[in-house]
Amino acid sequence: MKVYCLLLVLLVGLVSQAHGKPTKRCLSVCSAEYEPVCGSDGKTYANKCHLMTEACWSPTSITLVHEGKC
């Protein structure tokens, strides 16, 4: 049974690599601490973690412009 599970995990890994798209590893949980920052998209984010998470998932580049509200 252990061998079967190991083979299954390896197979899934090989199949995901065969598609050529790297898997994004974006943060999905940020603290609720409110330390607003302004993103290059003109939006105010609750904190730097929220901005970086949005930047990771966004198809366009989002960077930190300055600390504080936009």
Curated annotation (Swiss-Prot):
Signal peptide feature range: 1-20
Classification via InterPro entries: Kazal_dom, Kazal_dom_sf, Prot_inh_Kazal-m, Prot_Inhib_GrowthFact_Antg
One Gene Ontology biological process: cell differentiation
Domain Kazal-like: 21-70
Pfam families in the record: Kazal_1
Main location, first listed in the record: secreted
Protein purpose: Acts as a neurotoxin by inhibiting an ion channel. May also act as a serine protease inhibitor, since it possess the kazal serine protease inhibitor signature.
Record protein name field: Turripeptide Lol9.1
Species this chain originates from: Iotyrris olangoensis
